[in-house]
Design a protein with these regions (language model features):
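N-terminal secretory targeting modules
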Residues: 2-8, 23-112, 116-134, 366-370
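Sec-exported extracytoplasmic/periplasmic mature domains
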Residues: 117, 125-129, 184, 201, ...
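Conserved SGNH/GDSL esterase-like catalytic core that processes O-acyl groups on lipids
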Residues: 63, 70-71, 106-215
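Loop/turn elements at helix/coil->beta-strand transitions in domains of secreted/extracellular proteins
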Residues: 105-108, 148-155, 190-195, 235-242, ...
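Active-site cleft segment of glycoside hydrolase catalytic domains centered on the general acid/base Glu
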Residues: 172-190, 199-231, 236, 251-271
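Catalytic His-Asp segment of secreted/periplasmic serine-dependent ester chemistry enzymes
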Residues: 249-370
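Extracytoplasmic/secreted proteins, especially bacterial periplasmic and envelope-associated proteins
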Residues: 119, 123, 131-134, 138, ...
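Bacterial N-terminal signal peptides
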Residues: 10-23
Length: 370
């Protein structure tokens, strides 16, 4: 049986469809320096030599700091972490109009993303005829079966799959009204949403002269993430916390425009890191504190960070992601999760919600019972 990792809180701290982009690999990245890789999408792809973000120290990868947070650390800045914990304590049940309602209100926690995100969240459990079906492995099922879950917590599904037009980095894209419609069908208004998990590593993909390289990929992810956060506040104005995750390893070197490939899956984690750093450093474009001016973003931090190098355990915590164990391979793109992969990723997210001070005040029932 494959070992399942119990991740401690320091890690927590964090797919989908893309537009086509291609180009030659960067000559200064030894892992990408060879001529264009033979395009392939299967389990035969071995370790690339690229390091997980969590395993990199100062100036440790192409001159860029590693670590999930500034100063090559995997632990959040103390002031920023304390702010997140304080915001978490301010989250209360809201009625349809967004006003506090401790009796009939809801604490709504949902996601931004599409098929891979939905698999982790709900496991396609409302359609057992789908190719991938994880009815008990998913986050929603496991969270709602906790004895100490907050009884006012609501975990609705949002977007289920890409329609070919979705772009969550564009505030005018149909993704947003479609997400609102999906929530409305479950009795949820935009004013009730307070927490989101954004599993969206396709932010900003597009063609360019540098091809598949760092820092270009990371900058695309960072800038797209900022635009997404602005759109979130436009459509869900009471959102206070957003957890950000980049994608797991992709057993594909073919940028075919359908899903995230390598090395973008690897590089995009730096983009999330840089967006969080911008907020920690006080960038007005990501301000969450009304005492410091106009609020332009929710408070952000890492959700689960999934990337490992083609099944090689991470030095930081031993996490592995393997093909075919964790990846659905039958009639697949080798990117969607298998039920075992859903179980692993949902477990990481659930573990964070049960331990992270930015989550426990609203996720768990303070009385200890449901």
């Amino acid at each position: 049986m494959k070992k399942r990792l119990t991740v401690f809180p320091a890690l927590f701290i964090s797919i989908t469809a893309l537009l086509v982009w291609s180009g030659l690999t960067s000559s200064h990245d030894w892992a990408d320096a060879a001529p264009r890789l033979r395009t392939t999408t299967n389990c035969s792809i071995g370790p690339t030599g690229r390091p997980p973000l969590t395993d990199v120290g100062p100036d440790g990868y192409l001159g860029y700091d590693g670590g999930l947070f500034p100063a090559a650390s995997n632990t959040d800045n103390p002031h920023h972490a304390a702010a997140g914990a304080a915001i978490a304590r301010s989250i209360v049940p809201l009625g349809p109009d967004g006003a506090a309602d401790p009796v009939n209100g809801k604490i709504v926690y949902t996601y931004v993303g599409i098929s891979l995100t939905y698999l982790v969240w709900s496991g396609s459990q409302d359609n057992p005829n789908t190719d991938i079906y994880a009815p008990t492995e998913n986050f929603n099922y496991r969270a709602l079966h906790l004895s100490n879950i907050n009884p006012r917590l609501c975990l609705p599904y949002a977007i289920k799959a890409n329609n070919g037009l979705y772009n969550w980095t564009d505030r005018n894209n149909p993704f947003w009204p479609d997400m609102i419609t999906a929530l409305a069908q479950q009795g949820i208004t935009p004013a009730q949403v307070q927490v989101l998990w954004a599993f969206t590593p396709g932010n900003g993909a597009g063609s360019g002269p540098d091809g598949n390289s760092l820092p270009r990929n990371a900058k695309l992810q960072r800038d797209g993430t900022v635009r997404m956060l602005h759109a979130i506040l436009q459509y869900f104005p009471n959102t206070k916390i957003v957890y950000l995750s980049s994608k797991h390893f992709a057993w594909s070197t073919n940028p075919d425009g359908s899903l995230v490939w390598e090395p973008f899956s690897h590089d995009s984690a730096w983009g999330i890191k840089w967006a969080i750093e911008q907020q920690i450093n006080g960038d007005p474009a990501l301000n969450y504190d009304p005492a410091k001016g106009a609020v332009t973003s929710p408070w952000i931090t890492w959700g689960p960070y999934f990337w490992t190098d083609a099944g090689k355990p991470r030095a930081y915590d031993g996490l592995t992601w393997t093909c075919p164990d964790d990846v659905y391979v039958l009639n697949s793109d080798f990117s969607h999760q298998s039920p075992a992969g859903v179980y692993l990723q949902a477990g990481l997210l659930l573990n964070q919600m049960m331990n992270d001070p930015s989550a426990t005040p609203w996720f768990l029932n303070s009385s200890g019972t449901r």
